[in-house]
Structures are given as C-alpha cells and as structure tokens.
Amino acid sequence: MAGHSKWANIKHRKAAQDAQRGKIFTKLIRELVTAAKLGGGDVNANPRLRTAVDKALSSNMTRDTINRAIERGVGGGDDTNMETKIYEGYGPGGTAVMVECLSDNANRTISQVRPSFTKCGGNLGTEGSVGYLFSKKGLILITSGDEDVIMEAAIEAGADDVQVQEDGSFEVYTAWEELGAVRDGIESAGIKIDNAEVTMIPSTTVELDAETAPKLLKLIDMLEDCDDVQNVYHNGEISDEIAAML
C-alpha cells in the first residue's frame, strides 16, 4: 500500500475543486443511475449505491437530485445502459495508470482516453499490462480522532490495516467487499468518517521528480475531463516537498 498517501491529498483536493466547478456532478449522477440499475434502489442492500450516495452528498449534491438519479436507474431505459470498462497504460516517468470508465459507447470512450496518454508522453497499454500492480481495496478516511479508539473500532469492525498519517489523519483499509460493514462498525463507535470508497492501491510506486510530477497531474486532468472517465488510479509517488509546489 506504499505511496498512496503521497498523492491521496492531491487527488482529494482536486476532487473538491472539480465539485465546486460542477464538473463532477455528471459523473456522480451516472454512477448513481448505474448502481441503482444493477443493484436496486435500497442503499442498505446495495453497497455500490451507498458509496455513490455518500460521495454525492460530500460533493454537496442535493437529496432531490440523488433520488431522481436513483429513480432513473431503478426504472431502466435506454439512458441507463452503461458498462464499466478499465483501460490500462503508462504515464510520464513510467508510471502505471488505470482508467475506470462508465460508458454506453466504447468507441467514443477510447477516442477520448487514448489521445490523453499520447499528448502527455504516455501510451495506452493492453488489458493486464499494469493491472497486476494494483489491488482493489476499500479505503476509509478519518481526519482526526483518538488513535487507540480508532484502531480498536477499525479492528473490531474487520479492517485489514490502519495507517496513521503525518498530519494526524487515518487511512483504514478493508477488503473491498467488506467496505460497507467496516464503515458501519466504525460509525457505530461514534467515529466520524470523512470518506469511504472502493479504490485501487498500487503495490509498488514510482517516485516522480519536480519535472515529471506536473506531467502526470496533467494526464490525470485530461483523463478526468473526459465525460466517460469516472476514476483515475496511478502508482506515482510525489514527495511532500514537490506536492507543495504543485
């Protein structure tokens, strides 16, 4: 799990900026619709939908908008015919990049994703080319709290690992299938959770210098600007000193 915290803050800061500009709303609605279509409209019985709802609420989406998206998904129709597709490739500095897309037109999606890699000095790879470097995990972020209390609650709830960050925050890792159960267990202990999501954690990382780091972030920006792209994962490691300059 090395390297995750080095770029997690940049990712989350960017997500907040995107939400302020309204860029992320279309993607959130698309995920809500798809999650409801595949698993039903009950958040208590549909972990993917609950995660999508939590993410939408944290981005200040209204309950009315969320409920309408869920109703669209449950009701079906042509506009809900979305499929998840993962593209793999190499970014600046030899970084491994995985792009999670949700689309009803694979040709349109690849025509957006491939040029982003090319323009940033990377290249789109074949299926499996970098996927083996990542593990699908549940990740729970807790900004602050008593370390002993959080550790005990997380372990009791079934977490795989808890890491204390330099800023005093906590990253709780779970099997991705157990994310909802672990989240519920931690919350039942009275602990405030700031974010919970299924993500891809790199097993090895590539340290980026001051010249390469901005190029990787540019690639991420270009990919996230694509309407069909939901998430971008990478194994680039950016030091605190370089991150402070970005």
Curated annotation (Swiss-Prot):
An annotated GO cellular component of this protein is: cytosol
Keyword annotations: Cytoplasm, DNA-binding, Transcription, Transcription regulation
Location of the protein in the cell: Cytoplasm
One Pfam family here: TACO1_YebC_N
Q: Which residues form the signal peptide?
A: none
This protein is called: Probable transcriptional regulatory protein PM0980
Identify the taxonomic lineage of the organism of origin: Bacteria, Pseudomonadati, Pseudomonadota, Gammaproteobacteria, Pasteurellales
**Regions crossing the membrane:** none
